[in-house]
Amino acid sequence: IVPSDSLYFRQTGIPGEFEEIPEDQFDRTLDPSYAGEVRENDRDWSAWSPSYASLENAPLSSPDNRRYLQFELRLMSGGLLDKAIIDSVTFSYTIPAIADSVVAEISPVTAAIGEVNRFTYYLRSVFTGNKRGFDTVFIHTPFASTVTGVEINDVAISDYDWEMEDNSLKVIFANDRIETSGQKITVDFESLMTVSGTEFRGRVGDSQSDAFPQRVIAGDASADEEGNRLVVSGEIEEHLFSSVQFSSPVITPNGDERNDSLELDYILLKATSPVNIEVVVYNLKGDIVRRVYDEFDLSGPNKVSWDGTDDAGGTVPPGLYLVRLQADTDAGRNTEIRSVAVAY
C-alpha cells in the first residue's frame, strides 16, 4: 500500500489536542475550526527536495532506498498562446542497493572560520540482506581538501587512494570492501571552511560496479562522538576577511619581473550570497589612485593584483600608498587597510 502524503487529525475535545484518524473518518463537511487538521505526512515521506536547476542526468537529492517516489513538475509558458508539455520522465536506479543505509557524522562540529581545519568523518554500515557493499567514500567539501588517514574498524590502513572529484573528496579502499553490518570507517581530512553551518554531505560507492553512489544519513556513527550530524558551526568571528596578505611590502614596477606587482591574497568569510568586494589604492592625501577590483564574490580564497599603475594607465610615482579592501553587505561595511611602498 502506498502511504498517503497527508495525515488526518480530529480534535479530542481538549483545546489544542488532536488524535490521528484514517482519511475516511475525516469529516470535511464540518467547519474547518471543528473538523481538525490535515498535515503533511513527514512520517512516511521525506520532505520535498529543493527544486532542480536541471533534470538531465541529475542525481536525486531525496533520501535513497525508498520504495516509492513522488515528483512535482511546474510547467511555465512564455505567453497565452504557448503551451508546455512533457514527453516522458525517466528515473534510473541500480539493484541491489549498495547498503540498507550508511550512517555518518563529523567531528569536530565547531571549527575556525577562514582557516584550514582538521576533521574526522565517521561512517557505519547497515546491512540486512543481499546488498552490493562499498569501497568508496565521497565527502562534499567547500574547497579542495586533503586526506590524512583512513581507518577500517579502528585499524589504520595504508592501501587507499584519494582525489578531489566534482567538489568532493573521493577515497577508495578497494581491498577493504565494506560488506557486513556495523563496520566503521574513519576518514581524517583537512579542509578550509568559510561559512558557519557548512554541511559535509557524504555518499558511498562501489568502484567495482556501475552502481550509483548512495547518500549517507546523519546519525550516530561513532560511540565516541556526540555530534551525530554533518553540519559544522563556525566559531564566533566578527570580521569578514581573514589571511589578508601582501606578496611584498614594497613593489618596484620597473619591468624587470622582480616585485613588479603587488599580489593581495585574502579569504572572504560568511558570504552565502554574492558580496560586493572593492580593492582601491589611495595616496597619502586620500586621493584615489587606482580602482583595482570591484566584483561580487562568494566565500573563499581570492587573489587581486596591482601593477603599480593609476586609473589612466601611467606608472605611479615612488612613495607610500594605502590599499583598501572592503566588503559591502546587508549588515554594513567591513574594511581592511594596509600600506605598500612603491620604489624604483
Where are these regions (language model features)?
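Non-cytosolic beta-sandwich-type ligand-binding/adhesion modules
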Residues: I1-I95, S145, Y293
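Extracellular adhesion/glycan-binding regions together with long Ser/Thr-
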Residues: A47-L60, A156-T186
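Short beta-strand elements of extracellular/lumenal beta-sandwich folds
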Residues: E72, S107-D135, Y266
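Low-complexity, intrinsically disordered segments enriched in Ser/Thr together with acidic residues
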Residues: L73, L169-D206
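Beta-strand-rich extracellular modules
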Residues: R74-M76, E190-L192, G205-S207, T309, ...
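Short, compositionally biased P/S/T/A/G/V-rich stretches that sit at domain boundaries
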Residues: V89-A112, D224-E257
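Solvent-exposed beta-hairpin/edge-strand motifs
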Residues: F138-A156
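Short loop/turn motifs at secondary-structure boundaries
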Residues: V232-Y344
